[in-house]
């Protein structure tokens, strides 16, 4: 897993609901906890682009609803700055469901994926149709 060069603000908090951008059957996921988050006492965990979190499926197919899943944030509304000086922001907060090896569960990803995510997770980058 490569380091992300851009300074990513962590704007996806606990209890945030994100759209699912793949074809696994889930449509909406609520953040429960963020993996590898080191914060201060009593501070709620936050995630940014490229972070893995544990979520609960709120909308989707009957088989997927009410299940606990691992996800990677691929888009966020809050803008972030790349080392080149370019500022990037997306229209929505979105994620992709992954397995224990951080490989995507779905076979296609709808919408753009941040370049930082494609560099860190090669399988997500190869599945994505648009990389921004």
From Swiss-Prot:
Record bears the keyword Transport: no
Pfam family, one: Ribosomal_L14
Higher taxonomy: Archaea, Methanobacteriati, Methanobacteriota, Stenosarchaea group, Methanomicrobia
Example of a GO MF term: large ribosomal subunit rRNA binding
GO cellular component terms given for this protein: cytosolic large ribosomal subunit
Family statement drawn from the similarity comment of this UniProt entry: Belongs to the universal ribosomal protein uL14 family.
Organism from which the protein derives: Methanocella arvoryzae (strain DSM 22066 / NBRC 105507 / MRE50)
GO biological process, one term: translation
Keywords: Ribonucleoprotein, Ribosomal protein, RNA-binding, rRNA-binding
Subunit: Part of the 50S ribosomal subunit. Forms a cluster with proteins L3 and L24e, part of which may contact the 16S rRNA in 2 intersubunit bridges.
Claim: Ribosomal protein is one of the keywords in the record: yes
InterPro entries: Ribosomal_uL14 (IPR000218), Ribosomal_uL14_arc (IPR019971), Ribosomal_uL14_sf (IPR036853)
Function statement: Binds to 23S rRNA. Forms part of two intersubunit bridges in the 70S ribosome.
Entry protein name: Large ribosomal subunit protein uL14
Top-rank taxon: Archaea
């Amino acid at each position: 897993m490569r380091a992300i060069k851009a300074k990513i603000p962590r704007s996806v908090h606990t209890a945030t609901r994100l759209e699912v951008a793949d074809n696994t059957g889930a449509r909406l996921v609520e953040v429960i906890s963020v993996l590898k988050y080191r914060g201060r006492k009593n501070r709620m965990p936050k995630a940014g682009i490229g972070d893995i979190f544990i979520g609960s499926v709120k909308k989707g197919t009957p088989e997927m609803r009410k299940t606990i899943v691992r996800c990677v944030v691929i888009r966020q509304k809050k803008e972030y700055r790349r080392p080149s000086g370019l500022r990037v922001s997306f229209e929505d907060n979105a994620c992709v469901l992954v397995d224990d090896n951080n490989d995507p569960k779905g076979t296609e990803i709808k919408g753009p994926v941040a370049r930082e995510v494609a560099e860190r997770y090669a399988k997500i980058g190869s599945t994505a149709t648009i990389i921004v």
